[in-house]
Amino acid sequence: DFQPREPVNPLLFAMKKTKMMIEVQLTQEYTGESIHTCFMPFDDNMISLLRHPTENIVGIAGVSNVGDMKNWCGSEMTKANWYAFGKLASNLSLSKETIAREWLAKNFDTTDPRFINPMTRVLLESHEAVVRYMMPLGLHHIFAAGHHYGPEPWCNIKGGRDDWQPWYYHKADAQGLGFNRTYDGEFHDVQPGFGVNIGSGNARLYPDSLYNIYNKVETCPEQLLLWFHHVAWNHRMHNGETMWDALCHTYDQGVREAEAF
């Protein structure tokens, strides 16, 4: 549901006989509610899918809401995402930097490099910073229930749907953190231990080339680790840190990056 970082949806690989459009979100529902600067042109995986589409991927759509603010978009910098979507919809060969520089020059009516250069850097680095200080390492759905601007991983709305609750996704317990989406030979319905000791099987929905990467803790990209695995707090990351230390340091890195902007 438009989290700061998600793997490409497996439906794009599986629905071979159905024409599809890829939907992205211009409105920053989970990336600072159009208040935080978060420049989000398509990532390289999405660009690859769109540049070399199968016959059933026929277009793209952008989810957006205009508000009652003077600039429609919530904040001055949020407009960059609307502009980037329009540019990439018509020309996928454009680089993120080209779009950022062009938008800054047009929106602020200046070509002064003392402004364009540092603000281009802010735009290009902003998304990774947001991921780091909000939901790093594949963590997801830990936002507040009444709004999606800040975190509320402890949220547990009485009578609410389980799969709308943050705890359903982060699965934090004494052993570890993260949602187990691995495949053990069969797909499982929701039951005790689901998403922790019992994998949902979601990883098997991907082509073998991705399944073989995502399904193992050892090979899963660390930026998606907690999306696909329930990971022990003392699990050693590639840099030798425990998962807990890496999580704390990544949050801190994101905050420091945002402060530097």
Regions of interest found by a model, annotated:
Residues 1-64:
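Active-site capping/gating regions of soluble enzymes
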